[in-house]
Amino acid sequence: LVANATGCSSIYGGNLPTTPWAKNKDGRGPAWSNSLFEDNAEFGLGMRITADKQLAVARQLLQELKDELGEAYVKEILDAPQTLESELVTQHQRVDGLKAKLKDMHSSKAAHLLSVADQLVRRSVWLVGGDGWAYDIGYGGLDHALASGRNINILVLDTEVYSNTGGQSSKSTPTAATAKFAAGGKSGGKKDLAMQAISYGNVYVARVAFGANPQQALLAMREAEAHDGPSIILAYSHCIAHGYDLKNGLDQQHKAVASG
């Protein structure tokens, strides 16, 4: 489940006929949704709370039907590991079998479980947006989402300027950087969102730059997904507002990391 804040990522990620959000041969893939700029964190947190509630309902109904379905069969579904992709595929197959059984059962509980059975497969929730959302306009909601302790993943595409409105200086812009409204160089410092998240003690935090180290970026994504709790990845992102040809974007990421 993807909650995408309005901004550059929603424009290039949400327009047809091309889209980065794809489904596999079984018709399964990410469910993408776009929220307002200022409340995307709350929007994504709501997805997590809803998924958790529906899972609790499904598990309760499955327990109540263990006499009809078989206690061992119910236990297999409830206790199934769902960390690796292969384990999720197997759980999908279990749930498909469960739904086939439920269709032949004529009771209100079976019908109710059939409507929520898909929730027995683990849901991954990602909140995606830029630094204008995460560092500034949507920061209050983002902080609330991190403090909730819920199993959410946050990906911040950090260009260090307000990209969607033309490249203005923002709270993410580092000291002395030149941008619109800071032509002589920004006098203040860059907001340290990573340290603020770390202060909670239960949040997974990573900084990545795909162009500088793609292996580390992939590892951070996997670790964030595996962390049972809030996670946030601050991904340095190149942007047309930086003033260079974007065909050199990955090289610029490498230079940015090398320069500190």
Where are these regions (language model features)?
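Thiamine diphosphate
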Residues: 1, 9-23, 103-168, 205, ...
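Segments that form or flank anion-binding pockets
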Residues: 4, 12-54
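Active-site cofactor/cluster-binding pocket
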Residues: 16, 168, 175-180, 204, ...
